[in-house]
From Swiss-Prot:
This is Ribose-5-phosphate isomerase A. GO terms for biological process: D-ribose metabolic process; pentose-phosphate shunt, non-oxidative branch. PANTHER family: RIBOSE-5-PHOSPHATE ISOMERASE (PTHR11934:SF0). The gene is rpiA. Belongs to the ribose 5-phosphate isomerase family. One of its GO terms (cellular component) is cytosol. Signal peptide: none annotated. It comes from Lacticaseibacillus paracasei (strain ATCC 334 / BCRC 17002 / CCUG 31169 / CIP 107868 / KCTC 3260 / NRRL B-441) (Lactobacillus paracasei). It is an enzyme of class 5 (isomerase).
């Protein structure tokens, strides 16, 4: 089955977790595009009263264009549910996010949410994190020195570039440095070290935030729940 079809089916299944009256966080990425469409359709069909909080400019624009009422994070209380994609998810429900350059805002929204659900296709499930490059959102000033420090630690860093060779910018006008690690044996220790490095605004390790993952498979969407083991 086409990978986009798997994403679409998983997104449609995840949209079923949305309930009337909720404030919902809307993630960023190719899978979330289908999610926003599915939620907008539910609002139209079921007359749901929802408020959305977007994690990126492009998600907000899509949601508003489809009639989903949107507010900024500081304009709402706690978010009831945030649904987002992920670039990798391991068997312990830890993940890497940031392929879409939005992991800083995604993490801020996630930690302010009562519940987080990820939607992925089955290719994103891994035994060990790290094959997907780990993104770091970094302050532009002094980023070259930071890049060298990361290289000295053996973390194989590289600026993320646009097609024209310019440095890719986040919505917050920061740079992205990707770490090409191959395998992350101890994600919590790595996260702790990265948190101490001056110049790194946020890393793409999302640890201990999610208990439910909706997976698009060739046999239909499957729900993985950490509480069920």
């Amino acid at each position: 089955m086409d990978q986009n079809k798997l994403k679409q089916e998983a997104a449609q299944r995840a949209a079923e977790f949305v309930e009337d009256g909720m404030t919902i966080g809307l993630g960023t990425g190719s899978t979330v595009v289908y999610l926003v469409e599915a939620i907008a359709q539910r609002i139209k069909d079921e007359h749901l009263n929802l408020t959305g909080v977007a994690t990126s400019v492009r998600t907000r624009k899509q949601a508003e264009s489809l009639g989903i009422p949107m507010k900024a994070l500081d304009e709402v209380g706690q978010i009831d549910l945030t649904i987002d994609g992920a670039d990798e998810v391991d068997k312990h429900f830890q993940g890497i996010k940031g392929g879409g350059r939005s992991h800083l805002i995604e993490k801020i929204v996630a930690i302010n949410s009562a519940r987080n659900i990820w939607i992925v296709d089955e290719t994103k499930l891994v035994d060990t994190l790290g094959k997907f490059p780990l993104p770091l959102e970094v302050i532009p000033f002094g980023s070259g020195k930071l890049l060298q420090r990361l290289a000295d630690e053996g973390l194989k860093p590289a600026y993320r570039l646009n097609e024209d060779g310019s440095k890719a910018l986040t919505d917050s006008k920061n740079y992205i440095i990707d770490l090409h690690l191959g395998k992350i044996e101890h994600p919590h220790l790595l996260a702790e070290w990265l948190n101490k490095q001056v110049g790194i605004v946020e890393h793409g390790l999302f640890l201990d935030l999610v208990k439910t993952v909706v997976v698009g498979t060739t046999h239909g969407p499957e729900i993985l729940d950490a509480h069920r083991g």
